[in-house]
From Swiss-Prot:
Name of this protein: Large ribosomal subunit protein bL28
One record GO biological process: translation
Gene source species: Pediococcus pentosaceus (strain ATCC 25745 / CCUG 21536 / LMG 10740 / 183-1w)
Gene (UniProt): rpmB
Annotated family: Belongs to the bacterial ribosomal protein bL28 family.
Family matches, as PANTHER family: 50S RIBOSOMAL PROTEIN L28 (PTHR39080), LARGE RIBOSOMAL SUBUNIT PROTEIN BL28A (PTHR39080:SF1)
Organism classification: Bacteria, Bacillati, Bacillota, Bacilli, Lactobacillales
Length: 61
């Protein structure tokens, strides 16, 4: 399963509920992008969430 290298976000699981309170399993997936960033001074290709990219927590190489 892909996981955000910066924030640790990954797929979350839960239930979807109808008005009659029936339930079925569903998942919430973060918007992950595979980008090249500097890790310990070397370029590395990792999964990063779009939110981390937009907020400037990482910069592309």
């Amino acid at each position: 399963m892909a996981k955000d290298f910066v924030t640790g976000k990954h797929t979350r699981f839960g239930n979807t509920r109808s008005h009659a309170l029936n339930h079925s399993r569903r998942s919430w997936k973060p918007n992950l992008q595979k980008v090249r960033i500097l890790v310990d001074g070397k370029p590395k290709r990792v999964w990063v969430s779009a939110r981390a990219l937009k907020s400037g927590k990482v910069t592309r190489v």
